Amino acid sequence: MSIDPRAVVAEGAKLAPGVQVGAYAIIGPDVEIGEGTVIGPHAVVTGWTRLGARNKVFQFASIGDAPQDKKYAGEPTRVEIGDDNVFREYVTVNRGTAKDKGITRVGDDNLFMASSHVAHDCVVGSHCVFANLATLAGHVEIGDHVILAGFTGVHQFCKIGSHAFIANNTAVTRDVPPYIMAVGHPAEPHSVNATGLSRRGFSTEQVRNIKNAFRTLYRSDLPLEEAVTRLREAAATQPEIVPFVEFIGRSTRSLVR
């Protein structure tokens, strides 16, 4: 363990072996930090916050502070962060609120570029990339392998499915299904994220099936109910379509159209 003498580590904080804390960083009393995590200079980790192993928190990032919600009344809500995440300069991750489940969750192996923001009660999966100034409002759910390009804004309570790609300066106001590239202000479905899927090991046939599902939902002029029925039929023999169908069933803000 290496703690710069100019850092402030409150009594009660639990730091595992191999943790590094830089100059003028502040660690709160209810914080737990896993093995090998690096807290950079001037970073703040506070509140009821748990970071797993090998995370990197760069200078001036703020993890676990109070939610930006007028209804918040000081309840001991939490932030739970997995392993191998990178939080670059000025990233903010706020803890949850009692009006929801009281917790903000971040999975593993995510990259949060400078000045990106994860609001209260959000759930972020694993292997995601948040480019500079990508911003989540409260209660947003993000799947795995999602990319949010720079200046993306996501409205509260929206869901974005795994392997989706959101283009820069896009305003997401509805739910974005898995595999989709969305672009615009407000966001509209553009195409399938075929390049990303290929990089992650999807076969040519699987990508073709997903493209067919996209056409059924967005290019066939079918009523939504009929399109979903056809997708369910396809999912019976094409497992890669199952997440697509399940996501539609969980959508609460309607889908991008």
PLM segments and residue spans:
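Terminal amphipathic alpha-helical/low-complexity segments used for targeting or macromolecular assembly
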Residues: 1-6, 11-12, 17-18, 54, ...
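Structural signal for interior beta-strand "rungs" in well-ordered beta-sheet cores
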Residues: 2-188
